[in-house]
Design a protein with these regions (language model features):
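Extended alpha-helical coiled-coil "stalk/arm" regions
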Residues: 28, 35-78
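Feature targets compositionally biased, intrinsically disordered low-complexity regions
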Residues: 32-33, 63, 82, 110
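C-terminal amphipathic alpha-helix
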Residues: 1-22, 26, 72-128
């Protein structure tokens, strides 16, 4: 009887630990999703504005509307700097998505472990 009780305690602890980990990961996923969605929306808005500004800059350059080469170079450098910051934000978002996907895989792995634990307790599964 003591072996059965010890076995039950061990399995019960593992179930609870898996559930605790799943809850932590699920909460983290919800937070990450909100952050990613917000970052992507802002990035897309900023990219749209940036692309419009680049298009306007190129149009002014083709029409020779800059008062000097220095004015052209200053505005071009400012646009390049903004483009580089946008590229960095894109890389940050990609890293956030990668972390999110890794957490999804951890949650799926916990689900598979929980299923194996359930199957090991199901006497009919052991016979199959």
């Amino acid at each position: 009887r003591s072996k059965i009780v010890a076995w039950h305690v061990r399995y019960h602890q593992q179930f609870e630990e898996n559930e605790r980990q799943a809850d932590v990961i699920t909460q983290r996923l919800e937070t990450q999703k909100g952050q990613i969605d917000q970052a992507v929306e802002q990035y897309e808005r900023d990219m749209m504005v940036y692309n419009q500004e680049v298009e306007a800059f190129n149009g002014r350059a083709k029409r020779g509307e800059f008062s000097s080469q220095a004015a052209f170079s200053r505005e071009r450098a400012a646009l390049q700097s903004r483009g580089e910051r946008l590229s960095q934000r894109q890389r940050t978002i990609t890293s956030q998505v990668d972390a999110y996907n890794a957490d999804v895989e951890r949650l799926n792995a916990l689900g598979r472990a929980q299923q194996r634990l359930n199957n090991s307790l199901d006497s009919m599964k052991a016979v199959e």
